[in-house]
Amino acid sequence: MNTDDYSNTENSVDASHQPRVNLSYVNEAIQTETVVRRSLLYRLTQIFRLGQMHALSGLKALIAAMFVLAYPAMVIAGHKLNDSAVEFGDARHWSAPEIGVASTLIARELDGPGWISDKHEWHPQARLTALPAWQESLLSALSDHGQLLLDLLADERDPDLITAVRLLDASATHKTTDRLLAANEAFARYDDRVAGGVTRAPTGEDALIARLITSAQWAEREYSQLAAISTPGDGWLASSDSIEAVYKAKAVAHVTHAMLDAVADREQNMLAKLGVTETMSDALNAWETAARMRPLFIANHGTGSVTGTSHPAIMALHFDQSRLAVLKVAAQIEAARQERIATPSGPASVVVAQGTGKGT
């Protein structure tokens, strides 16, 4: 046996006698610990994610609840109806006061609540009933009054006034806000032309009588519409039909009162000479009563109901009184004119009396 064989034999014997260690349980323990750690981490992660999901769901629910509760409040807050008296600021002097009234009323709506018909359907103000009815009728009344001015001017119609009245037409396809801004610019140009003597505004007795008679026709129209709404025996509290009818009529009264008040202020000397100052004041008070009507809730109950209150019927009564009041002014003006025509002027009669020596 050589040396190499001996070495190999020794190595094989030593290898066979070396102890064999089973490390499988160690590996299993490590693997188990890893699995446990991973499982715990996974569970913690899942718990955290679940908590996040619940928190997010709760936040969404809270936001939704806040929105549901806040939306009605936003709807109520959006009801910004400005029915205060029209007052001209110091920024501009209006040579034609009626044009100033129209421009001021338009600007108040645009600068205040904005034009509701231009709002998106989801907007809180789009859910309102009274304010859209008010604005729709306000625009219609301004358009009617603008057309009246054009009729009074006849062949002297100003192109800027024609443009403004056309822009007030509700049948126009352009956005209402854009049309009203353009109309106000046209009104301002027309008023500048009146101030410069290039064109004129309707004044005098004939123009005043025409305004009074036309306003009486408007009052009769509104009376008929309100009477038709209030004829049923019973009605819902704050029904949409009743609300729209009352606030549309209210807008007509507001515009008519403001326009007649502006004319009366400009023509106060003429009214005094005609002896109708007090009668005109009564007519303005009648229109103002209709314009100021603003109950907390609109009711349209028949006489057989518990309250028996019908705001459309009450408004109709105000319009009938306004109609009679303006017709009385017109009749007195016409009577004064006829008396003036039939009676010789004062100074001329004095001269005749002095010449004959029979002064009276």
Identify the role of each PLM range:
Residues 170-210, 309-333:
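Short, well-ordered, aromatic-rich surface patches in folded extracellular/luminal domains
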Residues 180-292:
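Extended amphipathic alpha-helical interaction segments
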Residues 115-127, 196-199, 228-241, 299-307:
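Short, charged/polar, low-complexity loop and linker segments
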Residues 59-75:
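Hydrophobic membrane-insertion alpha-helices, especially the h-region
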Residues 2, 89-90, 261-360:
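A cross-kingdom marker for long, charged
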Residues 83-182:
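N-terminal Sec/ER secretory leader and immediately downstream segment
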Residues 1-37:
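N-terminal targeting leaders characterized by basic, low-complexity, disordered sequences
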Residues 40-53:
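Juxtamembrane low-complexity tails/linkers enriched in Ser/Thr-Pro and polybasic
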